[in-house]
Design a protein with these regions (language model features):
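Short juxta-domain linker segments that transition from a proline/glycine-rich
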Residues: 1-193
Length: 193
């Protein structure tokens, strides 16, 4: 069976043996409240994202991926705009507009996947996963919007979830929409235009 699966998918046979030995913990999952797909399908998408980590862990034997590069000195009492500014400074982005959130997240060690969710109402979601004591965030993009602007916003929204998780701020007390806006276009830049 392994051989047939390996040949059909074009994966090395070692992957199937190696993937079974990976002990992964899903620390948290964030699905946007506006997501309208049924809960049972949301569970399936979470599992697909878990499989993405298994594939990544296998590929790390051949490819060096960027390490997680997220600020660790968040203060949960800072306002949302200050938290967004802190991430921008940490990543040395200045105050300009961010054109490509996908590349920005990936070079900072956040894995972004397009799970090919061809369902209306499917939105991006995130997971924090740990394998062998190493944590990594994964973002899965919803596939019902093809606009680069919307995709950038969705990724900034998921970054807000990551920041809230790292700062240990409850979701109810943290506006991910406000963070996404402040991160993508800081107030200083907006008022200059």
């Amino acid at each position: 069976n392994e051989m047939k699966l390996s040949n059909t998918l074009g994966f090395p046979r070692e992957f199937f043996k190696y993937a079974d030995n990976i002990k992964m913990t899903i620390d948290s999952t964030h699905i946007r409240p506006e997501c309208t797909i049924p809960k049972v399908e949301q569970i399936a998408f979470k599992e697909k994202l878990a499989m993405t980590h298994r594939i990544l862990t296998f590929l790390e034997g051949y490819i060096q991926f960027p390490q997680m590069n997220i600020p660790t000195d968040f203060n949960r009492n800072e306002d949302i705009e200050e938290l967004a500014s802190k991430v921008r400074r940490y990543w040395e982005l200045g105050d300009g507009i961010i054109g490509n959130m996908l590349t920005l997240l990936e070079i900072n060690g956040i894995l972004v996947s397009d799970a090919n969710i061809n369902k209306k109402g499917a939105l991006s979601f995130s997971q924090k996963q740990t394998v062998n004591g190493n944590s990594r965030y994964f973002v899965s993009l919803g596939n019902d919007k093809k606009s680069a602007c919307i995709r950038n916003y969705d990724l900034a929204y998921e970054l807000a979830y990551i920041v809230a998780t790292e700062a240990n701020i409850q979701s109810k007390k943290f506006s991910k929409d406000e963070f996404a806006c402040a991160f993508l276009m800081p107030k200083e830049t907006f008022t200059q235009d």
